[in-house]
C-alpha cells in the first residue's frame, strides 16, 4: 500500500461522537489535509527514542478522536478512536507520511490526537515492541499495556515515548494551520549508566575489575508489566493482579566488558581503577529502561531497590602473575526517590578500600642490657 504524504485522503469517514452511526462526507477540494510534525521533548542517545530514531526506524502510531463542538473533555467517555486508530506515521521523502489520508472537518467538529512510539504493528498482542494497545472500540483515551523487554541480554529494551499534551486536543479546521505538532515525552525511567571508582589512588601495582552486576528489585516495587494511561499520563498496575520483577535480575551480560591480560589476570571485566574519573559500566550507545516506580515520585525508601556488584582486586606479583581477591554480591542500596518517570539516572559507586598502612614509632624500644661475658683466648 502506497504511503502518501502525511496529509491523507478519505472521502467518507465513520464518525463516532454524539451519534455512533453518523456518516460525514468530506470533499478533498474543500477539506484541508491533516499534516504532521514531530519533536521529542528530550534529545537522547543510542537506543533511546529521538526524532532521528523515529525517522530512521519504525515511526509512530496515532490515535485521533472526532467530537462535536462540545470538545474532548465533554465527550471522551463515549468516544472511540473513530478518526484514526494506530495510524502508522513514517518518514519518507523528507516528510512525515501516513497511509489513510484524513482531512479536517469543515464544520465545528473537533479532533483530539494521541500518539506513541516506537510503532507496534500487532497492537492486539504486542509482538514487536511488547506494546499492547486498547481496542479500536474502546471508549475514552487510549491505554498501553507495556512489558519490559529483557531479551538479548537486556539489549532489546525500548524507550517508550508518548504525546498526550492538551495542545493537540480539540483541534479544528479553523484553529489549526494544517499540521499537527507532536511533542513526545519519555514515560519510562532510564538507567543511563552505572559508574565505579575506588576511593583512593591504587598506585601502579593494584587494579580493580568489575565482573558482574545484578539488580535486586524487591518483591513488590518494580513492575515488569503495567498499564500506561494517556488520559492522565500515569502508570498503574495491570488488572486483576499486578506484575512485578520479584527475583534478582542479572545485568552482567549487558555490561561493556572486555578481556585484557593484566599480570596474568584475563577475565571478561571492566577496569575501574581510576579514582579521579569513575568508569562507566555501560556502552555509550546503550541504556536500561524500566517502568517507573510511583510515576514521578520514585521509590519511597532508600534500599527499596538495590544493586549487587562483583569485582576482583588484583595485585601484581610479577609481570605474569598476581594475587586476586574476589568480592561477590557487594550490596549497594539505591537512594529514595529514584526510578522516577521521565528521568534518567546515573549512579556512581565508590569502592571503599582498606589500605594496609604502616607507621613506625619514633622512639624505638630501648636496648636490653646484658651482662659482660668473659671469653678466654687460648694460646
Curated annotation (Swiss-Prot):
Annotated Gene Ontology cellular components are: cell outer membrane; pilus
Q: Which UniProt keywords apply?
A: Cell outer membrane, Fimbrium, Lipoprotein, Membrane, Palmitate, Signal
Query: Where does it reside?
Result: Fimbrium; Cell outer membrane
- Signal sequence span per UniProt? 1-17
Which Pfam families is this protein grouped with? Mfa_like_1
What is the taxonomic lineage of the source species? Bacteria, Pseudomonadati, Bacteroidota, Bacteroidia, Bacteroidales
Q: Which organism is it from?
A: Phocaeicola vulgatus (strain ATCC 8482 / DSM 1447 / JCM 5826 / CCUG 4940 / NBRC 14291 / NCTC 11154)
Give the gene symbol.
Answer: fim1C
Which PROSITE patterns does the record match to this protein?
A: PROKAR_LIPOPROTEIN
List residues with covalent lipid attachment of type N-palmitoyl cysteine. 18
The answer, when asked if Signal is one of the entry's keywords, is yes
- Give me the residues lipidated as S-diacylglycerol cysteine: 18
Question: Which protein, by its recorded name, is this?
Answer: Fimbrium subunit Fim1C
Positions annotated as pro-peptide in this chain are 18-45
Function summary: Probably a component of the fimbrium tip. Fimbriae are filamentous appendages on the cell surface that mediate cell adhesion and biofilm formation.
**What InterPro entries is this protein classified in?**
Mfa-like_1, Mfa-like_1_N
Subunit arrangement? May be part of the fimbrial tip.
Amino acid at each position: 500500500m502506497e504511503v502518501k504524504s502525511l496529509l491523507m485522503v478519505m472521502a467518507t469517514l465513520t464518525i463516532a461522537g454524539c451519534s455512533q452511526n453518523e456518516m460525514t462526507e468530506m470533499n478533498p477540494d474543500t477539506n484541508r489535509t491533516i499534516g504532521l510534525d514531530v519533536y521529542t521533548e528530550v534529545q537522547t542517545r543510542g537506543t533511546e527514542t529521538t526524532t532521528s530514531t523515529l525517522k530512521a526506524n519504525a515511526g509512530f502510531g496515532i490515535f485521533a478522536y472526532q467530537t462535536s463542538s462540545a470538545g474532548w473533555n465533554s465527550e471522551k467517555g463515549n468516544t472511540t478512536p473513530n478518526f484514526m486508530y494506530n495510524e502508522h506515521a513514517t518518514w519518507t521523502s523528507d516528510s512525515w507520511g501516513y497511509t489513510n489520508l484524513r482531512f479536517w472537518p469543515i464544520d465545528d467538529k473537533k479532533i483530539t490526537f494521541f500518539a506513541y512510539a516506537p510503532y507496534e504493528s500487532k497492537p492486539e498482542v504486542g509482538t514487536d515492541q511488547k506494546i499492547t494497545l486498547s481496542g479500536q472500540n474502546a471508549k475514552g483515551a487510549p491505554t498501553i499495556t507495556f512489558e519490559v523487554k529483557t531479551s538479548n541480554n537486556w539489549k532489546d529494551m525500548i524507550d517508550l515515548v508518548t504525546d498526550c499534551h492538551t495542545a493537540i486536543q480539540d483541534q479544528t479546521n479553523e484553529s489549526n494551520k494544517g499540521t499537527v505538532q507532536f511533542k513526545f515525552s519519555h514515560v519510562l525511567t532510564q538507567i543511563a549508566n552505572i559508574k565505579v571508582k575506588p576511593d583512593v589512588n591504587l598506585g601502579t601495582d593494584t587494579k580493580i575489575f568489575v565482573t558482574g552486576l545484578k539488580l535486586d528489585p524487591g518483591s513488590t516495587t518494580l513492575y515488569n508489566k503495567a498499564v500506561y494511561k494517556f488520559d492522565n499520563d500515569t502508570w498503574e498496575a495491570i488488572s486483576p493482579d499486578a506484575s512485578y520483577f520479584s527475583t534478582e535480575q542479572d545485568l552482567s551480560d549487558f555490561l561493556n566488558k572486555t578481556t585484557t591480560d593484566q599480570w596474568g589476570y584475563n577475565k571478561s571485566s571492566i577496569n575501574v581503577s581510576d579514582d579521579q574519573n569513575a568508569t562507566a559500566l555501560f556502552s555509550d550507545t546503550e541504556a536500561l529502561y524500566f517502568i517507573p516506580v510511583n510515576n514521578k515520585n520514585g521509590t519511597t525508601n532508600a534500599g527499596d531497590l538495590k544493586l549487587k556488584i562483583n569485582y576482583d582486586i588484583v595485585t601484581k606479583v610479577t609481570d605474569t602473575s598476581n594475587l586476586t581477591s574476589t568480592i561477590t554480591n557487594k550490596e549497594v542500596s539505591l537512594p529514595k526517590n529514584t526510578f522516577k518517570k521521565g528521568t534518567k539516572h546515573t549512579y556512581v559507586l565508590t569502592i571503599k578500600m582498606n589500605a594496609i598502612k604502616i607507621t613506625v614509632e619514633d622512639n624505638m624500644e630501648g636496648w636490653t642490657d646484658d651482662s659482660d661475658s668473659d671469653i678466654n683466648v687460648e694460646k
